[in-house]
Amino acid sequence: MATGKIVQVIGAVVDVEFPQDAVPRVYDALEVQNGNEKLVLEVQQQLGGGIVRTIAMGSSDGLRRGLDVKDLEHPIEVPVGKATLGRIMNVLGEPVDMKGEIGEEERWAIHRAAPSYEELSNSQELLETGIKVIDLMCPFAKGGKVGLFGGAGVGKTVNMMELIRNIAIEHSGYSVFAGVGERTREGNDFYHEMTDSNVIDKVSLVYGQMNEPPGNRLRVALTGLTMAEKFRDEGRDVLLFVDNIYRYTLAGTEVSALLGRMPSAVGYQPTLAEEMGVLQERITSTKTGSITSVQAVYVPADDLTDPSPATTFAHLDATVVLSRQIASLGIYPAVDPLDSTSRQLDPLVVGQEHYDTARGVQSILQRYQELKDIIAILGMDELSEEDKLVVARARKIQRFLSQPFFVAEVFTGSPGKYVSLKDTIRGFKGIMEGEYDHLPEQAFYMVGSIDEAVEKAKKL
């Protein structure tokens, strides 16, 4: 095992000099004793003359020139397999939940090649989430990739928590949650939410929070992905949740600047598309098992054309766009039914009835959107009878797209609801065909199935 010495420390970037005949490879892990702590560095560049430039995976406070650094001669390796379920780990796969050692049987390197073309498989099977607006407007494919797009505070994390809860309870699958650069408080809430729902023993949690150095936040997504790949290669259908993919890009920007690369548009790293591709190409389904991934994507200043969300769009099968405008109406989940898309919304995949219902709902909401200006200027009375009916139905549909969540019972005060796809289609079809024209629109707000709306109307 070769040993080198630190020659320069600039924040999270540490330069280490090794003997010329024992220079570590790019992505190799190095270890340095920093006081009582062991710090892991990852090689990013070979500068020549035996010097390598590395990124610290933890705080570089207290490092000084001349300290001895060991080359571990392999990339960062993390525990994989069933031993990781129910545990909280950091980027290096070390437990941070005070429950002792992981006791894993196997460790895998976090840098791995994506599956080859022959190994890939294509599935048309739908994954029911129990969330009406998602199942109807932007259905998820088993083994597909989904992005939850939204600005600050419109409900990305809450939606993600609800998805994990529903899928873990209703589908009893394994999940891996990678918290990339999010708030520590959210990670804590998340852990307790999973424990309260009794699904913690089916989830592996990997956290690299906002206060961690950029190298840590850049690699934590790969740590989570490696654990998911192991479950997939055992022949399971696994779910990978990444919250938040934007912070992964942001960490890449910070690392890129520290390594002295020239920034590109809006200050992002020049390797943005490649870094995103390296991660996304590994999140895929093979003939052995599937990885279905749900990724929260923070949209800076609500601008979907920003390079980071725009690069992410290219990799996704379904996009769930959360809208501040809908959230401000008090309709949660604040999914925009006109902006959200899915490759699965195709009559050959979902069936003609589902397709027609979804498109019908969209056209009614679109017409309502167009009529809003007329209503604002001239009032409802100036509309034709036909348009008045469209507006009434659109307002009912809009309210019926809301739903009480299990993980948000504390906020809404009403018990969470899981709605099957069959009930969802039946409800929206009924509203469009005028079966419920006699019910007041308040009856449709924050209910599960259409039968609950009918019951609620009796009490109003």
From Swiss-Prot:
One of its GO terms (cellular component) is plasma membrane. It catalyses: ATP + H2O + 4 H(+)(in) = ADP + phosphate + 5 H(+)(out). NCBIfam families: atpD. InterPro entries: AAA+_ATPase, ATP-synt_VA_C, ATP_synth_F1_bsu, ATPase_a/bsu_AS, ATPase_alpha/beta_chains, ATPase_F1/V1/A1_a/bsu_N, ATPase_F1/V1/A1_a/bsu_N_sf, ATPase_F1/V1/A1_a/bsu_nucl-bd. It is found in: Cell inner membrane. This is ATP synthase subunit beta. It comes from the Bacteria. Produces ATP from ADP in the presence of a proton gradient across the membrane. The catalytic sites are hosted primarily by the beta subunits. ATP binds at residues 150-157. It comes from Salmonella arizonae (strain ATCC BAA-731 / CDC346-86 / RSK2980).
